[in-house]
Amino acid sequence: MQGPHAQMTDAAYEIRRSEIAALSTDLAPEDPIPVVEYTEWEHEVWRTVCVDLTARHRTDAAAEYLESAEQLAVPLDHVPQLRDVSGRLGSISGFTFQSAPALVPLREFCGGLANSVFHSTQYLRHPRSPFYTEDPDLLHDLVGHGNVLASDRFARLYRLAGNAAARVHSTEALQFIGKVFWFTLECGVVRERGERKAYGATLVSSYGELDHFRSADFRPLDIKSLADVEYDISTYQPILFEADSMDEVEDTVGSFWDTCDDDSIAALLGGTSRSVTPH
């Protein structure tokens, strides 16, 4: 991103990010989402990324993502207030947002999903790197997750992931549920008319990921195969799993989350512990 805001120092950015995070540090679930007075550089980052992503989505995003995004109609020309988007999303699919100061622990995050609540940050990525961030930010949470949560199918899948996490007790089982979430709802790809299209939130909210994802090593979507693949959120994904249709995603992933428990996941993992870093 060119312009004066691209020269913002790391120290100034961290101060601003901390200011926004502090607004939600002590919020109770029933408290209203804070209103953030966004600065011009934040609006500039939002506009720059959204304009470029919208163009890329026409060729690279799955049809169901595009339809859902059109329904939610997140503004492209300014940073929206999270509480406004939350209200609109709630009227569409029943999901709402809860403001979070940063990435929340996986069990807490999934607990929200079970109750149709998505924890979202309210700060934006550094203006020096607007097209990719390894940390979740408002762009990732709204353009990536918010847009698909306006789809009834995706809203069901997110709830199923949350309910699955609530059923399990072992760390290994919880982490594996998180891994399935990562390779589908974060980094999922589907074939449409012979072309690979992205539907995962990490892919559709990152120009860099959309540039890179078709060069990945693609494997058929299979829950057992996921157990043997690790991931690193700090880089573009070298391995992705693709489905032949969104119905296959719903059948494969939805059925797993709907029925899994500690024992079935332990059997799937072969009794061994595999450590992953949840996003």
Swiss-Prot record:
Optimum pH is 6, and the enzyme tends to precipitate gradually below pH 6.5. Its EC number is 1.14.16.7. InterPro entries: ArAA_hydroxylase, ArAA_hydroxylase_sf, Aro-AA_hydroxylase_C_sf, Aromatic-AA_hydroxylase_C. SUPFAM superfamilies: Aromatic aminoacid monoxygenases, catalytic and oligomerization domains (SSF56534). The record marks C187, T202 as: Important for the regiospecific hydroxylation of the phenyl ring. The keyword Oxidoreductase applies. Changing C187F: Loss of hydroxylase activity. Only a small amount of 3-hydroxy-L-phenylalanine (meta-Tyr) is formed. Tetrahydrobiopterin (BH4) seems to be the physiological pterin, however the hydroxylase is also able to use 6-methyltetrahydropterin (6-MePH4). This is Phenylalanine 3-hydroxylase.
